[in-house]
């Protein structure tokens, strides 16, 4: 796999630190990417530009570019793996399986379905069949307990039964077992019973902690769920990196919630032609107003967060601005990628990426 790397940039999270615009280097191999410097953020306030996370010694969070959907691979420092969602039904898990093969994942210890929408579990059945047949299988599966009658959901549950896999319904207050060093807290759906507003409100939301580093993923949880999480888990939602809710749609990342999350970097997972116009101008303006670094899989491609618990780095498949205002100015309806003036589109299709 070829990923694009930037120079090392160090900031503090003390409230006064800011990113300094950096220049970009030549494209590098996957091995170079995973061992070399990139955007380096200190969580402790101690500037240590020599601190470079290494594969399987740190927490890795891979945002796989699946188009109009979401799929996130988390690798714990001990090598344990968690796949959160698998992208849209149209792709049938092909991009996810290809990516997992490229990064040498032979077993998925934890498979999470944040909600039964096809943009999140579209590849679950294919991923289960592939790893149960060709590799070391799937450990355990987790979901919100909300079901649908869709063909995609039926295929997913059929695959679970076919391969005799256990599935656990989780709720706020639960913790998922994920290595000795990493804590994965479930903060949605409510433990008192699923909300009547449907699958999105009941999306599984996870707060992932590794020492001083916190990552927040809320799937499609909307305003009502965000209010509840803000009231019940104010410390859990405060995060260094936030995967923007509902692919950047205006139904999520509300003002108060985003203010309490207070991230240093945000990731938006959606396609260039988002089904519901994601990311929305409202959300992009909110991100722009805070100056937070923003990464969009439609413009940055596969995006990897690496943290040693003190610092975190952001590595992207493609060089692109991280200014939310500039990203928000891209035409959502464009049929081809719009590249800002002075930048070159170096994206490569998955079929041309190799280790």
Predicted regions and their residues:
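Sec-dependent bacterial lipoprotein signal peptides
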Residues: 1-14
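Non-globular, low-confidence helical/coil segments that flank catalytic cores
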Residues: 13-355
